[in-house]
From Swiss-Prot:
Annotated signal peptide: 1-19
GO cellular component: extracellular space
Main subcellular location of this protein, as a coarse class: secreted
Keywords: Disulfide bond, Protease inhibitor, Secreted, Serine protease inhibitor, Signal
Boundaries of every Kazal-like domain copy: 26-85
Matches recorded under Gene3D superfamilies: 3.30.60.30
PROSITE patterns on file: KAZAL_1, KAZAL_2
Marked site: Reactive bond: I47, T48
Gene Ontology BP term (one): negative regulation of cytokine production involved in inflammatory response
Name of the protein in question: Serine protease inhibitor Kazal-type 7
Amino acid sequence: MKITGGLLLLCTVVYFCSSSEAASLSPKKVDCSIYKKYPVVAIPCPITYLPVCGSDYITYGNECHLCTESLKSNGRVQFLHDGSC
């Protein structure tokens, strides 16, 4: 009985660990389409510092600043990952 309970517990832990790891590996997307209604020079970005790394390996202060650069570059700059580069 103890072996069955231990095995069940082990399987449960392995299942939840593998599920959360798979979820964290899914690529995050940044939706820049909400900024297209503004002229690129007048996008109202918040001053909140939540750094993101762009595909040009430049750290942007937040997703809005990344989207501004992405729109300026016609989509060449994309989201790479959260945090500093």
